[in-house]
Structure formats: C-alpha cells, structure tokens
C-alpha cells in the first residue's frame, strides 16, 4: 500500500517542526522522524488508527496516535492519504 500526504498535512508537519525547533532543534527532528515512522506502519496495518466517528464513513477515515501527535488519514483501495497532522493539545481539525 502506498502512502501520500495532502498539501495540508505537509504544511502541518512543517508547522509542527518549526514550532518545536524554536526551543529544541534535535527534538523537532526526532518528532518529525517519529511521525513519519508511525505513518509508515499504515502500509502494513492500514486499520491501525481509530475510526473518526463524526466522519461520513468512519471505517475509512481514521486517526493514528503517535506519541502526542495525531495523523488523520483516509484509506483507499491501494493508498493511504494522510489528511492532517496535529498535536493533541491543538484544537481538533
């Protein structure tokens, strides 16, 4: 299964990294790597995340919790689309 990132999720990752980087550059890099590794697990385990109950089709829209971060994604036939990424203390998207 292939993983793709929406433009919004790419901007989310950049924003999160930049926010942490101000205080701790190495932590920002570790967090970015951790999120990308977590998302890569979806290639093998696409249903790893929890269903997003408010989604029109919660079976295919899921949230993957990666430490303090959440990656929302959509499961398609041969592809995982990462929709958004945020810190759990941020307002939900």
Map each language-model feature to its residues.
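Absolute protein N-terminus
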Residues: 1-2, 93
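Basic, Lys/Arg-enriched alpha-helical interface segments
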Residues: 2-60
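Enriched for short, Lys/Arg-rich terminal
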Residues: 66-93
């Amino acid at each position: 299964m292939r993983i793709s990132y929406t433009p919004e999720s790419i901007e989310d990752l950049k924003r999160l990294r930049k926010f942490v980087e101000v205080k701790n550059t190495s932590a920002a890099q570790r967090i970015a790597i951790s999120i990308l590794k977590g998302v890569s697990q979806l290639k093998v385990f696409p249903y790893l995340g929890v269903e997003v109950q408010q989604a029109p089709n919660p079976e295919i829209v899921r949230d993957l919790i990666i430490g303090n971060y959440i990656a929302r994604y959509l499961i398609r036939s041969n592809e995982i689309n990462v929709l958004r990424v945020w810190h759990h203390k941020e307002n939900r998207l």
